[in-house]
Amino acid sequence: DPKTGVWAECPGYSNVVLNDYTSFATLFDRNLNYDLVKAMPVLSKAVAATPQYLFPNRMICGFGDTHPGYLNTNPISRMIRNAQHNGKKEQEEYFTAMLKCFHPDAGKTKDNKKSVPVSINSFFDEKPLELNPNIEAGKIEQYVSPFFYAPNVSWLVQRNGMNPRNSLMISLNASEGNHMHANGISMELYGKGYVLAPDAGIGLYLYSGLDYLEYYSQFPSHNTVCVDGISSYPVMKSNHSFDLKSSFPVSSEPGKAFTSVTYS
């Protein structure tokens, strides 16, 4: 989405797509000296938007075919590589601070040049990332919004802070986009350090357990699996979104001051 940077799938698949896009852009830039991030600025916007998926405990929302986990920071690293390769200081500062926030050990010993194995792949793989030591880690509040709404996946978030213990949050999702399922509205709550009523996501056994089969209307069947020889799209990629009539606060820009009350 050019306005929000959110890919039109659930968080689990969105992060995979973003990882692949940024990986290709890095490869393209390094070997052909063509800046795809400049040509497609929505890429950097998409990377900057990924923290919006986070609960105050730093784990991502689990709606749709998603397994809750932590943020993949590889796309952030690649935005830094892109900035360094093309002399974009402002972009380097922004994403370096973000990377140090979500991955404090990035660029340290395990990423050191000495740890790179001697291999033919070293001619093609990404080289160890060197971070500017003068750039300090950002604060997580700089990268999330008190209120965030992505209509292309019919998903909104309200939060009053990012304190793992004391902050509250709600993640509300209908069914719009891919891997979302047409079985109503998903609502995940957060309080006292816990995700309350977490979405079942892809289930305990990654699509193959009864918890997945009995929660959703069918197994995934438009991707690589055909159930009873029939593959159907309407259940997995549906168009059953909710309409956001009003909200407070209005702005969804990250870094805005949190309010004690939010409304939608």
Place the predicted regions along the sequence by residue.
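Extended polysaccharide-engagement surfaces of secreted carbohydrate-active enzymes
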Residues: A8-S264
